[in-house]
């Protein structure tokens, strides 16, 4: 039953209402408070009106409700109606919300870097001119926080859900985070200050297993809910434990909070289960005390008469109010109804807010200088302005990872360049967990694949390229200095270097040429061999040079079936001792003069005689042979052990195989 409580006053804007017909205020945690006010036409301007032209000035104005000249509710007027029924003049119905409604902006996108959630909430409340009592438990700075297609108020509610923060409007200000000190308890007793009281228990506890992945540490993490009644009073603990056997299977869920350590995950699942089971033990009651509001703490007592002069009283504990309805009638009769949960709870019930589902976004790369050298990039999405940007995000690749032999960068490593346009995806649809799906050409950067889409290419920012041409079936690799490898698709390869080419082989190197080999050197050629040079030529070796010098430190041996030493000018053979041997015949010829000269003694010996003639034999000079090229094709014999021997082939019309032993002089 309501009782008169005369000192109730209402002000809209600068207008104080002299009277009103009724007032109702609905309050709950994690949501706007809503009010409905009914006033007569005199209070709204003029009773003899056909419209609401006078009272329309109240739209958008603040409304303040006072009890005993002390404000207990502040709101904003959002709706006015002229209501008529029957033959009376009617009334004005005024409705609206708590001042938090100023944060009910149109769905918006915004982002912050290196800020705590408390910093973000403080900034948004300042923008909405909403008083704030801030004491967020999560104080770490986050590298990236993103509001995505949400009003400012829904975004704050979502932060409270993700980070398990207390959030409620107490009638005058928004409370974010559990207050450092809860309000002093107000004693409420059934039978005196409470006209009705209901006490309830419900089975809300369910086992869960929460998983997440930390890419920086390459670590999969998961934790089960503790399934213990932390923060619950005795009755709630009994109901908590009674509920668990009904759900033997733990639900698997991803962590909606970005966590970086196993301790963070353990704390998250602890508070998550505490919030989901906060209303396990609850009370609902009615009172006439206008001091109560959402967030008030009450010391609840139950009492009744056991007999004349015998009052039985029992403390039910301290409770915190989470839902409340205030009602004031025309004669200032006041009453309220509320729902409360034990004051020992670790978390309030979760705000009823949906997690946003981020869609693919186009973005521009701002930096690829990952401070950790992990190949990540920072990008700016189209809606991000000023200094807004993502944190360092990973880049999708067709193949990437590590292996036993390759610890990092195994696979395709193609990091977008600054200024590139990329497409972003989002893990679990979370706008704070973007990754690069790939790059996009646009009207100024794309050139297509040529006619018939025949060109496939890979090009770096400096001009290094790999070009595959399906028209002529060719492949070309170029660097920025002009060096190239060209495979023309017809079996030919062209290797070109404007400067130098070096070939290094740690062990062996084989060069196989099926037909001709031509080597052109513009200046000089040097060949250094550590042990032995072995050259096997099937037909001829021809050397053409203006000057030739051979330096042999120890032994020089030339062996041939026939040998010709020919000079157009002069041949000199000089040695401390020189032997010229013809096993059957030795013939020394000069077309003009032959001189045998010795500064010592000349000896001529013939075992069968010595003859002298004054008539010379005729001598036909060998015809000089000239050629321009030589082709060599050889390989080692199968039983080669270092001696002079080969398996060799002549590919003309037939093939013959023969082993030649050159070890005998």
Q: What function would you assign to each model-found segment?
A:
Residues 81-96, 327-340, 372-378, 433, ...:
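Short, solvent-exposed secondary-structure boundary/capping segments
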Residues 70-76, 305-320, 429-439:
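Short, Lys/Arg- and Gly-enriched loop/turn segments at beta-strand edges
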Residues 298, 360-589, 593-597, 603-604:
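Structural signature for extended repeat/solenoid scaffolds and their inter-repeat hinge/linker regions
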Residues 95-193, 241, 255-260, 371-394:
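Charged- and aromatic-enriched interaction segments used to assemble
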Residues 1-106, 280:
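Assembly/oligomerization scaffold segments
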Residues 85-86, 149-155, 160-342:
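Extended, domain-scale alpha-helical bundle/helix-rich regions
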Residues 7-10, 548, 555-556, 563-564, ...:
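Intrinsic-disorder/coil detector with helix-boundary
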């Amino acid at each position: 039953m309501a009782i008169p409580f005369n000192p109730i006053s209402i002000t809209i804007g600068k207008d104080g209402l002299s009277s009103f017909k009724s007032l109702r205020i609905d309050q709950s945690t994690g949501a706007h408070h809503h009010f409905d006010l009914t006033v007569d036409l005199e209070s709204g301007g003029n009773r003899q009106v056909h419209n609401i032209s006078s009272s329309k000035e109240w739209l958008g104005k603040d409304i303040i409700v006072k009890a005993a000249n002390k404000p207990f509710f502040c709101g904003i007027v959002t709706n006015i109606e002229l209501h008529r029924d029957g033959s009376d003049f009617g009334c004005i119905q005024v409705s609206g919300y708590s001042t938090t409604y100023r944060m009910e902006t149109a769905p918006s996108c915004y982002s912050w870097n290196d800020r705590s959630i408390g910093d973000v909430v403080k900034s948004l409340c300042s923008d909405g001119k909403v008083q704030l009592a801030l004491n967020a438990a999560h104080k770490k700075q986050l590298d990236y926080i993103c509001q995505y297609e949400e009003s400012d108020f829904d975004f704050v509610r979502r932060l409270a859900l993700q980070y398990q923060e207390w959030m409620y409007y107490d009638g005058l200000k928004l409370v974010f985070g559990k207050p450092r000190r809860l309000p002093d308890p107000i004693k409420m007793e059934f039978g005196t200050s409470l006209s009705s009281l209901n006490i309830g228990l419900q089975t809300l506890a369910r086992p869960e297993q929460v998983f997440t992945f930390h890419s920086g540490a390459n670590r999969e993490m998961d934790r089960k809910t503790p399934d213990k009644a932390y923060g619950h009073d005795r009755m709630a603990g009994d109901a908590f434990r009674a509920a668990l056997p009904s759900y033997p299977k733990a639900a698997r869920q991803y962590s909606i909070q970005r966590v970086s350590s196993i301790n963070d995950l353990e704390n998250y699942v602890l508070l998550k289960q505490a919030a989901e089971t906060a209303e396990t033990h609850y009370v609902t009651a009615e009172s006439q005390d206008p001091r109560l509001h959402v967030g008030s703490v009450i010391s609840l007592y139950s009492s009744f008469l056991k007999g004349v002069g015998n009052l039985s009283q029992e403390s039910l504990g301290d409770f915190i109010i989470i839902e409340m309805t205030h009602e004031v009638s025309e004669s200032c009769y006041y009453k309220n109804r509320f729902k409360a949960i034990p004051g020992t709870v670790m978390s309030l019930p979760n705000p009823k807010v949906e997690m946003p589902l981020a869609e693919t976004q186009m973005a521009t790369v701002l930096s690829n200088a990952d401070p950790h050298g992990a190949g990540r990039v920072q990008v700016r999405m189209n809606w991000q302005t000023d200094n807004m940007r993502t944190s360092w995000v990973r880049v999708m690749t067709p193949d990437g990872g590590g292996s036993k032999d390759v610890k990092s960068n195994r696979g395709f490593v193609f990091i977008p360049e600054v200024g590139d346009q990329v497409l972003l995806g989002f893990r679990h649809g979370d706008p704070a967990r973007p990754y690069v799906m790939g790059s996009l050409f646009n009207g100024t950067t794309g050139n297509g694949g040529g006619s018939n889409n025949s060109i496939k290419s890979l090009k770096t920012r400096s001009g290094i390229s790999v070009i595959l041409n399906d028209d002529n079936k060719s492949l070309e690799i170029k660097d920025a200095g002009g060096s190239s490898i060209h495979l023309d698709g017809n079996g030919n390869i062209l290797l070109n270097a404007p400067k130098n080419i070096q070939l290094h082989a740690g062990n062996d190197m084989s060069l196989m040429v099926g037909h001709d080999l031509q080597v052109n050197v513009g200046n000089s050629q040097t060949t250094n061999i550590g042990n032995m040079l072995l050259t096997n030529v099937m037909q001829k070796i021809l050397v053409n040079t203006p000057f030739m010098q051979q330096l042999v430190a120890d032994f020089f041996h030339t062996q041939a079936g026939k040998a010709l030493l020919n000079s157009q000018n002069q041949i000199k053979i000089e040695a401390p001792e020189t032997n010229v041997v013809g096993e059957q015949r030795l013939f020394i010829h000069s077309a003009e003069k032959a001189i045998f000269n010795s500064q010592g003694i000349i000896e001529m010996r013939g075992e069968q005689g010595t003859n002298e003639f004054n008539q010379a034999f005729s001598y036909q000079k060998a015809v000089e042979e000239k050629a321009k090229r030589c082709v060599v094709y050889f390989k080692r014999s199968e039983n080669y052990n270092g001696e002079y021997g080969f398996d060799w082939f002549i590919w003309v019309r037939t093939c013959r195989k023969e082993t030649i032993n050159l070890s005998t002089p």
